[in-house]
């Protein structure tokens, strides 16, 4: 054992010396290239003296980075993440200036702006060298990973996990590719955009679509997947009359309240309650290990900082610099892609200026890097269940469209992240079964504003006889709505100003993708159709007959074009009216109609089954949130050692690339049994956890290592026996193992 430790220490010393040598050479090269950076005195020095100065400066910079950087990042935890990323260059440059100041006799100096460049290059080169050495020395890398796992077991005092020498049951890693629909996944694999995922589908994985609820967006889907209930989540944002507040799924206070309601309704903490980790999600899933989780982001406790995930990542200066460089590159890429789309005259197109390039870079670079690093740390720690959300595709697809060159590049980078995670999984202290899934897809289409020249809010206000902007009033839709109001009120056109109701009756109009919500604060409770028509005689007719509107839901009644009406409580009526929106549309609408906080009027945009296009009520040319098209068909992809999501479905084992027959254009209806709703996905994931002898879902946090079952609830069935486990393919390079 002593000899092994000496060998390990010797290898570590050699790696440090090699990184130091490469950093020294890099500094010498930069001193020769950059005019404002020198490593010699004003009188000149010998080559030997210049070399010694570079050795001193490189060593001082490396030591300062290792000692000071974690403290600086911890002090900046409360700084907004975007600002923290931009400060990386300044902080690294400052450390270099300090290092140069430590050299005796003033033999080195650099202009501040040059110091930033030198520090960035040196950090990137040092990081690349360290990674290359780790790749070459597989044994040292593997020993380091197992040491990290042993440290975790020692910290837990052996109470948790598997005893030394015993094989741990396999863990479950759930990676959510936000917004990637089933058809997008199929094409990405067929077009070699995602070779890692395609390889899994050919050897050991299978994929199938599942159907979302009417509210096809992350808030509803992820709440259902992680907590088992998305009841009373009618949209991404909605108005609650009893409080007078607008709930927004990506607002921290709203997310915390939605999570509280789901826990209260289900009676358990969530999917990840025992030894789980939640990374980059809206909700915690009951996990103790959290990073970038919105529902707890308002907490400021020492043990659960809102941006603890950033500290775990940015405490390594090389990671910080690498991410900062990628951040800047992504901003430049977005600006160029936006200009290119404008020059080519691409249609449809939305504005991509303002802060959007920074927002996109944060989602596609910073959040991706932090989440991937956190997942790697979770695997090295051997956690039983991990759920992480990678949001890059969804963010880009909103502004570039679900299909195209921009999103193709994002899918390629997502595949590289998956490959990196799979490579690290091979060195984890336990095997991991990797499941990929998405929360929704995206449907393309020109925005409602771009197609008709006015927003849904403009149309509603015009239909209520309220003032609208001159631009909206001059559109055909606005003029028709205004005329309908006057006709309904039996007033001549010149008397339209008398038709304006008081301000207290103005509706609240909200948009969630191609789903619109209209609430009347002045009407207590849920407004009936008759009550709305008395207050605003032309509104419902104006909306239902608009070419950009597919249908309305008003108090148990579905309204379509040309006076079509279907009652939800009459069998078959809604199914016939909503048939163009796909199977299950009527049932999804019927479920939402039962929500306490459903809006007075729910508006789903028009949908073209031939093109799959919808009209978002927001400025998005790739949208989701309602019914129509690929937005309602996300995917679930699992290793075949796990049971089928639906035991009644037996896919053809010879089907190409492991894709499910549910995707066939003309499937056998006796064979296809689709998963419906996020709550059904939650049930499948719970079953897979049980199959791995993994965590159960308790009513409350476990006491004394055991979780009690709630009274009156059935005891979990024992896990099914058997099942051989396969390994996952290797790809990419190992991650820096210092990230925990």
For each feature predicted by the language model, list its residue ranges.
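Intrinsically disordered, low-complexity terminal tails and inter-domain linkers enriched
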Residues: 643-671, 700-736
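Active-site-proximal N-terminal segment of extracellular/periplasmic enzymes that hydrolyze or transfer
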Residues: 142-205, 450-451
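His/Asp/Glu-rich, glycine-adjacent segments
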Residues: 135-140, 230-384, 389-401, 517, ...
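Juxtamembrane/disordered regions of integral membrane proteins
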Residues: 1-114, 128-133, 137
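Active-site nucleophile/metal-coordination loop of metallo-enzymes that catalyze phosphate/sulfate
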Residues: 182-319, 468-521, 526-528, 694
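A long, amphipathic alpha-helix that forms part
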Residues: 365-366, 370, 378, 386, ...
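Active-site neighborhoods of enzymes that stabilize oxyanions during catalysis
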Residues: 250, 255-256, 261-268, 275, ...
